Amino acid sequence: YYENIFSSNFFEKVDGMKVRRKYRIRTYAKTLDMDTPIFFEIKGRNLERTYKKRMKIEYRYLDFFLNKELHCKLLNIYPGNEMIKNFVYDTFKKDIKPYILIDYIRRPYVNKFGLYFRLTFDKNLLSTRGKNLFNDKSHLSWLECKAGYTILEVKFDRSIPAWFHRIIQSYNLNRRSISKFAIGMTTCGIAEETSA
């Protein structure tokens, strides 16, 4: 995830700012080679709607995303791309840079019939200060976040299926906003929520 020394993205999230966005580089691989899928993502909120936009980036351009001195070259590599324009603007306006790594094990389940419905179970959440996804990770000090907990993430269009609604009622489950980014920032001692 990208962040600055003031933890602006963290505080925008925990303070519930209605308009915000943050950036990350994402991969599901542990090592880097020419075929490693790498994604550039923007996650944000615009009033009552949250969104995530993603684009695949080529291995050869990864350094352009990680090195601020090369960010302006992205405008030529991806001409007319709004995600890139916003990213370059925000890297200079907010002075963001790669700041923290978040890792976890994910089990996704997607409904193949009817309306879009997706469950993911994220466990073994780890975080560390760092800026490069593929450095030798043996020197990084990974910290456990919420040890023993699994995060259930529910995504759907319009409504959840009746069978899942019954599970929620049976176990008296409550909706709760969880940010793996914010948990990681807190666990690493980079930022801390303040109470009003």
Language-model features: where?
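Phosphate-end processing signature that detects enzymes handling 5′-triphosphorylated RNA
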Residues: 1-196
